[in-house]
Regions:
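Well-ordered mid-protein domain cores that form the structural environment of catalytic cofactors
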Residues: 73-74, 81, 97-100, 105-108
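Transmembrane helix boundary and interhelical loop/hinge segments in multi-pass membrane proteins
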Residues: 79-100, 113-114
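Secretory targeting signals
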Residues: 65, 73, 116-172, 180
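Short, charged cytosolic
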Residues: 1-7, 91-99, 121, 150
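Transmembrane alpha-helical segments and their membrane-interface loop/helix boundaries
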Residues: 1-73, 160-169, 175-296
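Membrane-interface alpha-helices at helix entry/exit sites of multi-pass transporters
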Residues: 105-117
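Long, hydrophobic alpha-helical segments
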Residues: 63-89
């Protein structure tokens, strides 16, 4: 006999509840409408410039990165809104106590809440394929680029979603949880960027004072691997220019073959690191839920 596929019960419940609501349909329609408007604006700008300088078809190549960055931004906003109210929302509806009486583990609860948010992301990605296909017709992008972008969106959704579930397990109000989730994400981006640029500025000033050539930030550049958006930047650079962050470090004067070799694998290295961080956030969320269960 064939074994039945086991599905996370929390994930299954969220899918059933979500399928009965029109909110997801309206949200997906709104997102795709926004993407279509962006495409129409870019085509209008190209047509207007054609009157003076002729059609600049090479400008349409930027359709893909612009749409891709917009999608990443939307995922960064939508997923926190969904996940930041996952646990705190159950508290507000006073249904968390009932959920904790079931044999479902607290980690399964956290993973199920994240999985339901990722289902929304996957639905959003699938419905955006017709809009993104315009970048293939006009911008000359390949299907591999689209698959890579979808992989980046899934990775970003998991990272941001795990932070949202953690924040939702810490605070009691969904609004506060949403703000805290966005604040943590923005804080990570700002801190890693500021540290890198501070090191670069300091090293560059010291090299100028000594009259020697600046040889790049060195291993400090790897702190940007903690930035969840750095793999997306590397991916876009490789799609558009054929080179990634490794080339950028080389142009900054980096001579170390080890640093350059590691930076060529920037995307997988950064994704693995951030997925480990995501798992830690989920474990912490499960621990916080366990504390709530033990108090009952």
């Amino acid at each position: 006999m064939h074994k039945r596929l086991h599905m996370n019960p929390i994930w299954k419940k969220e899918l059933v509840v979500g399928s009965r609501s029109m909110k997801m349909s309206w949200a997906i329609m709104g997102i795709n409408t926004f993407l279509i408007i962006v495409v129409l604006i870019m085509l209008s700008i190209t047509n207007m410039s054609a009157a003076t300088s002729g059609y600049q078809y090479e400008n349409l190549i930027w359709l893909f990165p612009i749409l891709g960055c917009i999608e990443c931004g939307l995922v960064s906003l939508i997923v926190p809104i969904i996940t930041s109210g996952s646990i705190s929302g159950e508290r507000e509806r006073q249904t968390l106590d009932v959920m904790l009486t079931t044999p479902v583990t607290t980690l399964s609860i956290a993973v199920g809440k994240l999985g339901s948010a990722m289902s929304v992301v996957m639905m959003y990605m699938i419905t955006s394929i017709p809009v993104m296909a315009i970048a293939f017709v006009l911008g000359g992008m390949s299907w591999w680029a689209l698959l890579g972008l979808f992989g980046m969106l899934l990775y970003l959704g998991i990272y941001v979603g795990s932070v949202g579930v953690f924040c939702s397990s810490v605070v009691k109000k969904s609004v506060v949880s949403t703000i805290l989730t966005i604040a943590i994400g923005v804080g990570i981006i700002i801190v890693t960027t500021v540290i890198l640029y501070a090191v670069i500025a300091t090293q560059s000033a010291m090299c100028d004072a000594k009259g020697v050539t600046y040889t790049g930030p060195g291993a400090v550049a790897f702190i940007m691997m903690l930035n969840p958006y750095s793999p997306i930047v590397d991916f876009m650079m490789r799609v558009m220019m054929g080179t990634g962050i490794d080339r950028l470090l080389e142009e900054m004067g980096t001579k170390s073959s080890i640093i350059l070799a590691i930076s060529r694998w920037w995307i997988p290295c950064s994704i693995v690191i951030n997925m480990i961080i995501s798992f830690v956030f989920l474990k912490l969320a499960a621990r916080n839920i366990s504390v709530t269960r033990n108090r009952k």
